[in-house]
Amino acid sequence: MKVEYYAMKTPPDKKSTVGEIKERFDADVERFSNLATGQQAVIDAPLMLDLISELAVRIKPDARNLLDIGCGAGNNTIAIIRKRGGMNCDLADLSLPMLERARERLANEHTGEVRTFHGDFRELTLPSSNYDIIVAAAVLHHLRDDADWESCFGKIYGLLKPGGAFFVSDLVFHEDEGVQGEMWRRYGEYLESMGGPGYSGKVFDYIDKEDTPRSLTYQMDLMKKAGFRHTDVLHKNSCFAAFVGIK
């Protein structure tokens, strides 16, 4: 099925509230506990998960402290722990049921101390200069205006130890309308191939209602502005990307 370009209709100030986003994830724990179903709408989700977990332990082989922002059911933390066990893991999420499921799953893994932080990451009090690895997978697209984005990247930078690594995998948009239109069209065709006729419309509708993604270049510029000395693109395919900043 041919999928045409889909333009966002909902302005940022009319998007889902934090409470509404929390309710959606509270009700969907089982699906997000399974990578095959929870990440069906994400192009190359298994590849990005493997890349980030592999590079996390390669860049920081002696890492002791890990923070997973918007951890969901713990998929990224589990992938990293299985390649480098024994780390202390701090898990942060809006959804208490998600946090409980992540903690439950990590109980079966070789970890150090596991702590959970329930709430909006922007409002959580976390230890500064404490983390060797920070991961944010499919979460930053909920940030809204420029001040929100800049504040969040600055906070993450402050939480990392010198030499620490900040990994992101997420939905991204594009600065040029023509590029965005083509990438969005290709994403729609991918969705139809995965979920059948009409699936792209469902996904596009909740993106329009809930998400405010920014471009990969915008986010990497923010990393530099926050102070990260090295930044690298790990992977990009259509509207999804994985990238890293080193403090």
Whereabouts are the PLM-identified features?
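A short beta-strand submotif of the Rossmann-like class I SAM-dependent methyltransferase core
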Residues: 136-140, 168
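C-terminal alpha-helical "lid/dimerization" subdomain adjacent to the S-adenosyl-L-methionine
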Residues: 169-226
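A short His-aromatic
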Residues: 141-145
